[in-house]
């Protein structure tokens, strides 16, 4: 995968040399380039922002440097990348979107600052490439850099060969619309707390059922919206019994066997 990131703080992305993302870069699985937006300014002050039309607080990022940056990194006539713009006004980022982005060959991130990027930049970009405005959640950050770090980590770990055990992707939170069950390791007893006996039983069927039950209970308690979004046919009678025991009425519909 080829990724370009444009920011006025390129040094913000130094952590992308570390851990599994760093390995993905070293192996060529992830080809990442970080660009300074100010490289596309032409005044002595390297200006990237100005006051907003219509008044109001803060500053808005000017269209000229952004236009030149996008022209340079996504030349007209070439295969367009997918442009991602982190913004509190964007669609919520999710594991499903991470999987969608992991299938792209070229991602281009535009890190806004201040009150955001002049809307004309995004409107013009949308005429020649797919544009997705994306939000990490219902809160506001100083800029898009933190969001890009989060999105890149979520996407990179889905690329082939990045994780040593691809089975990790099947059991983790959000993989099947549920939060992950609690995890335990050695020792079996610690500070008067023992690992659940079923996990030490060696009975893989019982272990899988225990984990499913725990995932359902945890998701009901912490993210009832996720339970409500599950397809009724994805729940078997045992699932429904667990949910009802946790105080949640499973939606009516076909029942999984």
From Swiss-Prot:
Name of the gene encoding the protein in the UniProt record: trmD
Protein name: tRNA (guanine-N(1)-)-methyltransferase
Function, as annotated: Specifically methylates guanosine-37 in various tRNAs.
InterPro entries: Alpha/beta_knot_MTases (IPR029028), tRNA_m1G_MeTrfase_C_sf (IPR023148), tRNA_m1G_MeTrfase_TrmD (IPR002649), tRNA_m1G_MTases_N (IPR029026), tRNA_MeTrfase_TRMD/TRM10 (IPR016009)
Cross-referenced CDD domains: TrmD-like (cd18080)
This protein's UniProt keywords: Cytoplasm, Methyltransferase, S-adenosyl-L-methionine, Transferase, tRNA processing
UniProt organism field: Salinispora arenicola (strain CNS-205)
Positions of S-adenosyl-L-methionine binding: 112, 136-141
HAMAP family cross-referenced by the UniProt entry: TrmD (MF_00605)
